[in-house]
Amino acid sequence: MGQQVQHESRINVGEATHVSKAEMGANTMFATSRLNSNNKVGPELAYLSGVASSASDSSTAAPSPCYLCHKPAALHVFGLAGRYVFGSVKREAYLSQEGPRSGRTPNRIAESLPVRVVNDFGLRLRVVTNQGPIKPRPPRPIDAIVFASIETRNRLRGFDRSFCCSAPPETYVFLPRARETIVLRANIIKMSSEQQASAGQPVLCASGCGFYGNPATLDMCSVCYRQHCLLNGATMATGPSSSVAAASAATVATGAVTSDSCSVPSAEVNGAAFSSKNNPEPATVVEKKAPANRCASCKKKVGLLGFACRCGATYCGTHRYPEKHACGFDFKGASRDAIARANPLIKGEKLTNKI
């Protein structure tokens, strides 16, 4: 299987420690690089039962009951941009419980697994790279992916914290191209509410009711916004009243534009405005004429059974005819005008050069 490897003396927790390629190969049995199916160069590393071995030996190692929480697992990221995360410990099924798959993008892992900083088994993450002494910016997205995947696998198998030793080893992540990969991990952080709003995603209510809010209502839902307006003493305009107010505002604006366009001296306008303000004219109230409930000839009370004549008066059943109440309305003239309006006279133009 290989020799035991001691890591405590040369790696600091939470830092991306610089390790030369020769030292990495000597201490961790760094496997020879190879071209994968996508023509990208990447190393193969595997830690089984506390022993470093090549990926070809990983299939012969039987996992112990607390295999994932007691023994350090190895992940490796390869490719020019570090797009794929591969697990070389008994295939990827031990890390992401998705079955033996060739690789998963960081976004897919972040979406499918819960984000946690510390798991129940005390695993810690250490980044080993040969690109120089750099610190991850930030390291939390990488930690969350590894912790959540291993923790989910252990919970499904029914493992408990009591099986863990007092000082469990760390989980190592080897990044051959650490700079691009760490920057890519920083993009996995969940967007803030402002970024979600700018991206067009729904934003939760600002009052914390759990429903979605609307930027037009101060990022609150309709119910919370109504309560907010009632508490602040604001009057919420309804649909018809708001439309009437908008129409009146448009009328006022049109009148203002028309008055500005007229060539009237400013002194006269100011004087008229001042006089109208000091001496307001009484408002003319147009009252609707009450319907007559008595006959205009015999003064008999007819109520709702009266007959309205075209002359403008109301009569009973006996005096409703024009010859009974000496009606002065010109029925013939009205009919003649109606016929003339309905049948206009069309005359053709006279020919000037008529032969």
Swiss-Prot record:
Zinc finger (AN1-type) boundaries: 289-335
Keywords associated with the record: Metal-binding, Stress response, Zinc, Zinc-finger
ZnF (A20-type) residues: 199-233
Binding site for Zn(2+) 2: 295, 298, 316, 319
Any Pfam family matching the protein: zf-A20
Regulation: induction: By cold, dehydration and salt stress.
Molecular function terms from GO: DNA binding; zinc ion binding
Positions that bind Zn(2+) 1: 205, 209, 221, 224
Binding residues annotated for Zn(2+) 3, in chain numbering: 309, 311, 325, 327
Function comment: May be involved in environmental stress response.
Protein name as catalogued: Zinc finger A20 and AN1 domain-containing stress-associated protein 3
Upper taxonomic lineage: Eukaryota, Viridiplantae, Streptophyta, Embryophyta, Tracheophyta
Encoding gene, per UniProt annotation: SAP3
